[in-house]
């Protein structure tokens, strides 16, 4: 027997005395009993050397798709080292920016260049991207600072106003936007006007958007908000509707999560949505947890402890396994991409493992 989606954290549902829509969940459904991770035959480690030099590879925030027989990985690059700033390049192009690399085997990656979007303000960095294929297009949702003219009374400062941008591509490299306006800005009762770490996924006729933000007014605790748009819409600023109006739908509550939940990434397996997420800030020992949902909206922790912790002392990820990006290949095999660092000096690189969901 089907049951309706229950949404406990939005005034909209309470105000009308009903749910927002009927979910596809079934009474009694349960998540898998075990999630197992397997290393690839060769360790995948990727770092971009463009900005810090050959001795300091760096990459964060991975997201991966497969397109025309090739794998595309999108990620964040840090600002240029002072001694490596290119000449005759606008200052804003030396800041944090999104990068692109390609591979044929998920292990060996070649840098293609930076994310560039025709039609969007040139100062948008397209950082911490979420890239998905749907509607016959490749869609990117990423964060940027350029939000001139946006009313944001709860931004901690105009310079740190983070909003989400959207663009599409046919080939995975050249992106276009039909507007010079951001796609989403957080407007709720509990957070700053801040949205980073976008994740989009489909639930019925809705496209769901998860984002990380910080509580108002201190901005010390990172939590997750959720919005939805009609599937097939333009996914612009007029299309998204906040669900987490009164409170976050997910926040740090376990000791290892400390004061931060961020980087949600979602996959559906056998009628269950699994959300992998990062707990604790990057300057701490970030690790990866999992929550699950029967309706794609209300999520419960699958385990109280991290399912993918940082590595042992002396390993490349001894101080972090964080910012997950889930990817399902054409053959159904699921991979978890993630960032890691060996020290607290920010020496981030990217890797991946196979994921097995076991009943």
Model feature map: region roles:
Residues 27-126, 132-193, 201-259, 267-317, ...:
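Beta-rich carbohydrate-recognition and catalytic domains
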Residues 3-13:
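Bacterial N-terminal signal peptides that target proteins for export
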Residues 12-21:
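Bacterial N-terminal signal peptides
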Residues 263:
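Active-site/pore-lining binding-face segments in mid-to-C-terminal subdomains
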Residues 320-326:
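A short, acidic, amphipathic alpha-helical segment used as a generic capping/interface helix at domain edges
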């Amino acid at each position: 027997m089907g049951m309706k989606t229950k949404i406990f954290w939005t005034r909209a549902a309470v105000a009308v005395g009903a749910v927002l829509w009927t979910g596809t969940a079934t009474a009694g459904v349960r998540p898998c009993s075990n999630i197992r991770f397997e290393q690839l035959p060769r360790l995948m480690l990727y770092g971009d050397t463009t900005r810090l030099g050959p001795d300091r590879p760096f990459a964060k925030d991975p997201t991966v798709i497969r397109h025309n027989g090739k794998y595309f990985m999108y990620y964040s690059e840090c600002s240029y080292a002072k001694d490596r700033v290119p000449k005759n390049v606008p200052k804003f192009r030396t800041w944090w920016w999104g990068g692109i690399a390609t591979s044929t085997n998920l292990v060996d990656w070649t840098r293609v260049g930076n994310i560039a979007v025709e039609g969007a303000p040139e100062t948008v960095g397209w950082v911490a991207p979420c890239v998905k294929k749907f509607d016959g297009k490749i869609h990117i949702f990423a964060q940027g600072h350029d939000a001139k003219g946006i009313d944001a009374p709860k931004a901690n400062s105009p310079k740190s106003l983070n909003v989400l941008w959207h663009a599409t591509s046919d080939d995975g490299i050249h992106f276009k936007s039909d507007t010079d306006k951001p796609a989403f800005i957080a407007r709720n009762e509990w957070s700053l006007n801040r949205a980073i770490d976008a994740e989009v996924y489909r639930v019925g006729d809705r496209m769901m958007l998860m984002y990380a933000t910080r509580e108002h007014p201190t901005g010390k605790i990172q939590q997750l908000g959720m919005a939805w748009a009609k599937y097939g819409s333009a996914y612009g600023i007029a299309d998204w509707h906040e669900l987490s109006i009164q409170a976050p739908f997910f926040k740090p509550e376990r000791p290892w999560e400390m004061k931060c939940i961020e980087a949600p990434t979602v996959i559906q397996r056998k009628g269950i949505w699994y959300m992998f997420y990062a707990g604790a800030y990057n300057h701490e020992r970030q690790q990866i947890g999992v929550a699950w949902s029967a309706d794609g909206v209300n999520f419960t922790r699958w385990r109280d402890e991290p399912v993918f912790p940082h590595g042992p002392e002396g390993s490349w990820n001894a101080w972090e396994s964080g910012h997950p990006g889930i990817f399902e290949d054409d053959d159904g095999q699921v991979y978890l991409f993630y960032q890691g660092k060996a020290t607290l000096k920010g020496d981030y690189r990217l890797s991946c493992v196979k994921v097995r969901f076991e009943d």
